Amino acid sequence: MFEKLVAIEPVSLIPSAEKELFQYVKEVVLFDDIPADDDEIIRRIGNADAVLLSYTSRIGRAVLERCPSIRYIGMCCSLYSEESANVDIAFARTKGIRVLGIRDYGDRGVVEYVLHELTGLLHGFGMPMLHDEPVEITGLKVGIVGLGVSGKMIADALA
């Protein structure tokens, strides 16, 4: 259990998720604006042992050195690689701070959206039809640009 969690900027939690935080932490502080600089981030974190941030702010070595209470940082944004992260994960590791990001969130919704739009285009549901006659998805040859997680899931759904 954590003592204090601070979301240093808006992290887009739904109300039920905000309530659920109290299962893991005694005190929760959620900021609804983006901090201007490292000094503001340090002030917001204070003595918190858990921190949440989105993609707009950065927690670098200077912040980590001045916030010795941090044990956990939750990145409420994509974490593609340690090198591209907006948290100095390598330095955090040397301080025993666990940093977790979100991977592959929203991918199922992307697949559903693509299939919905493709069906609409092929059958003219809510938009002009691509061809003169409706076309079935089954057996359709489709090119997908990018075969990351979403691209692979779309390919699987169309297979």
Please place each PLM-identified region on the residue numbering.
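A short, Lys/Arg-enriched amphipathic alpha-helix followed by its capping loop at the start of a domain
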Residues: 15-27
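A short beta-strand-loop structural module common to alpha/beta enzyme folds
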Residues: 27-36
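Rossmann-like dinucleotide/phosphate-binding beta-alpha-beta segment
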Residues: 1, 133-159
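Rossmann-fold NAD(P)-dependent oxidoreductase module
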Residues: 20, 113, 153, 157
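Phosphate/diphosphate ligand-binding glycine-rich loop within oxidoreductases
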Residues: 49-129
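Structural motif
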Residues: 7-12, 32-33, 54-56, 76
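Structural alpha-helical scaffold elements that stabilize or flank donor/cofactor-binding regions
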Residues: 21, 43-44, 63-66
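Short, well-ordered alpha-helical microsegments
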Residues: 14-15, 38, 59-61, 151
